[in-house]
Amino acid sequence: MAIRSYRILTPDTHNRSVSGFDGRVQLDPQKKLTSGQHHCGKGRNARGIITARHRGGGHKRLYRQIDFRRDKEHISGEIVTIEYDPNRSAYICKVHYKNGDKMYILHPRGVMIGDTILSGPKAPISIGNVLPLTNMPLGTAIHNIEITLGKGGQLARAAGAVAELIAKEDRSATLRLPSGEVRLISENCSATIGQVGNITANNRSFGKAGAKRWLGKRSEVRGVAMNPVDHPHGGGEGRTPIGRKKPVTPWGYSALGKKSRKRNRYSDASILRRRE
């Protein structure tokens, strides 16, 4: 769905754009499929100490209960609505299954209201259907991919995300993820066929600082603009450089390019090529 730009009538509408909701996208969720969220002290731990900076505030939200497992095998479901979800960049779909259950799922690109979806090993190769990786042909575009069997999809869930099945060997499937990483996953794990919808989400221009504050994101102050007591980059007369060979975090650790992944993780053997 296209990005909608504002006419420049006030300073806050200059260079501002939002996701263009058309007549298909609804804003009001089904009450039984939502739950409240406790957001007291965003970015704080149990003692009230800031552990994640630049977070706080934001508009009140209801959490939509998304079915990432898609484990209703051989029970067809009909797409009833396409809805906005404030908790993620992708849109969501409300599905009515033949057995009477109602669920939310991620909206696959190209799926329309009235379409039918199916899960299971014998489901057809069609956008929105869920199958084990072993039953998919090579080159299939997929999203909402399981890492652990039965745990539900954990990879490629953002708006526009898509991975590719590039090989199958020794009961493992090789995937190329949206980040460029190539890794192995058990071929018994399931995934949804197709790409996540709302592919133009990254083209949105916030236009003003308040639009970020609505999302619960606070402004970030540069370390070089601080005092020496607050940041290793701080201090100096006027506009001075950081005074170091390489930039560091407020706590003195290397930043901007330093690999932060822990060594000797159990999943290292599954990663064939690091992300780009």
UniProtKB/Swiss-Prot annotation:
Location in the cell: Plastid, Chloroplast
This protein's GO CC annotations: chloroplast; mitochondrial large ribosomal subunit
Keywords noted in UniProt: Chloroplast, Plastid, Ribonucleoprotein, Ribosomal protein
GO process annotations (BP): mitochondrial translation
Gene Ontology terms for molecular function: rRNA binding; structural constituent of ribosome; transferase activity
Sequence segments annotated as region (Disordered): 225-276
SUPFAM superfamilies: Nucleic acid-binding proteins (SSF50249), Translation proteins SH3-like domain (SSF50104)
Assembly information from the UniProt record: Part of the 50S ribosomal subunit.
Family: Belongs to the universal ribosomal protein uL2 family.
Annotated protein name in UniProt: Large ribosomal subunit protein uL2c
Species annotation: Pinus koraiensis (Korean pine)
